[in-house]
Swiss-Prot record:
Quaternary structure and interacting proteins, as annotated: Component of the DBIRD complex. Interacts with CCAR2; the interaction is direct.
Entry function: Core component of the DBIRD complex, a multiprotein complex that acts at the interface between core mRNP particles and RNA polymerase II (RNAPII) and integrates transcript elongation with the regulation of alternative splicing: the DBIRD complex affects local transcript elongation rates and alternative splicing of a large set of exons embedded in (A + T)-rich DNA regions. May play a role in neuronal differentiation and is able to bind DNA and activate expression in vitro.
Gly residues bias locations: 530-545
Gene Ontology biological process terms in this record: mRNA processing; regulation of DNA-templated transcription elongation; regulation of RNA splicing; RNA splicing
The protein's name in its UniProt record: DBIRD complex subunit ZNF326
Family: Belongs to the AKAP95 family.
Chain positions of motif Bipartite nuclear localization signal: 238-260
Annotated stretches, region: Disordered: 154-194, 243-302, 472-579
Gene name of the record: ZNF326
Organism in which the protein naturally occurs: Pongo abelii
Repeat as UniProt keyword: yes
Amino acid sequence: MDFEDDYTHSACRNTYQGFNGMDRDYGPGSYGGMDRDYGHGSYGGQRSMDSYLNQSYGMDNHSGGGGGSRFGPYESYDSRSSLGGRDLYRSGYGFNEPEQSRFGGSYGGRFESSYRNSLDSFGGRNQGGSSWEAPYSRSKLRPGFMEDRGRENYSSYSSFSSPHMKPAPVGSRGRGTPAYPESTFGSRNYDAFGGPSTGRGRGRGHMGDFGSIHRPGIVVDYQNKSTNVTVAAARGIKRKMMQPFNKPSGTFIKKPKLAKPMEKISLSKSPTKTDPKNEEEEKRRIEARREKQRRRREKNSEKYGDGYRMAFTCSFCKFRTFEEKDIELHLESSSHQETLDHIQKQTKFDKVVMEFLHECMVNKFKKTSIRKQQTNNQTEVVKIIEKDVMEGVTADDHMMKVETVHCSACSVYIPALHSSVQQHLKSPDHIKGKQAYKEQIKRESVLTATSILNNPIVKARYERFVKGENPFEIQDHSQDQQIEGDEEDEEKIDEPIEEEEDEDEEEEAEEVGEVEEVEEVEEVREGGIEGEGNIEGVGEGGEVGVVGEVEGVGKVEEVEEETAKEEPADFPVEQPEEN
């Protein structure tokens, strides 16, 4: 320190002499471009070099305030000089005050040089004054802090030589609360060294915080504000900290989907056959449902053409073909039986139920055959569709119609060329995709079967099937009406389902629904079918639900919700794991 002392003495002496000729204004001064009124004639004007040197080197060789000039050459403003006859070397840390003394008074004895110098090495004393005291302590904005009572600041930030590097001073308690409300940003906090931040303000007891953390940048006048403000500020910070955790929980609450279906189910069970209001509501619901089906049919007709309704489909296996032989072979194939076995394994249905589900697919095939026979002008319709497809296309557009092969497993269209098809069959994407698609079909087949059995029309049919009757005989005397209904049902299914198979299934389900909807729904509600009896009427009504499920679980759920409105979901079907 000898070299540093000599160097500092000479540098400061020169600086002080240079400033002697300058007019010093100890009133309101400007520091860093900001006008500040420091009250008791505190340091103003250009900040002298000695304040920087005192900060950097922590000079403590001279106790300012007693020389001929008000400020010694090696110190900035020392608040103790304005306090009267106090000991200049009394503890600025407040250790000599009775209510706060813990170490036996001031730095007398062995603490006079060693301990104080060790603290001064951090540049915080400035001859007992605070490195932040001069520019910050007497601000107009803090009238409550005008009374300096000797508790000067010692901060871990004071070692920064440049005032611009210092964060806004705050107290030792964190959250913007100064430790000395009656003084400046108080209390010579040296908790950065792990020691006690002495002085929590007069009347607050002499217990200091240990190891508290500074939170610079938050300034609050706690002398002029009530304690509620302090609490509000702290609480505001807590709220901000907690918000990120509340948001995910809020979104998580929206997850449960069982609430809506349960409400619908309870509403569907409550109405009775004799209640006219419920009947009117049921009619309105049916009309709204049919209107949706019509719109879906129009949409699907534009998308796929009218020919899609002429295809034979298996709702469980997602199989589609335009040839009767192909569908007959499929219904007798091992793959179709494997799908039914998977459904039985997942849902634990009885054999009677599985036979009924199979008969529903057979009946669907028969209905499509009848529709084809009645549509004698099918070829003409196809030609018209072809014209519509190429409408507006001219030679200048260089467009032509070609055939393509659609791969459902990969969701791609392949040119109808032998080489292209063979190349796709051998591609790794197709080999991997077909396995995943097969598993997807199995999962969706369970949902399809469940939704079919939850349909009230299907439940009524199942009851007749269990009794040994033919549940599909009703269609014979009203085939025309049923066909129209089926078409509408198909529309409903087609809308949610991009695949044509699903659309056909829905058409059949709705077809049956229009013919028997009102009567069967009432019967089912009266009967209150339980157990397998709830499976009534799976036939065509079930197909509608099936189609929705073919495209995915989401679509299936939509179909189930619509059916739940009209039916009592009594069927004791064990939901598959996928659900």
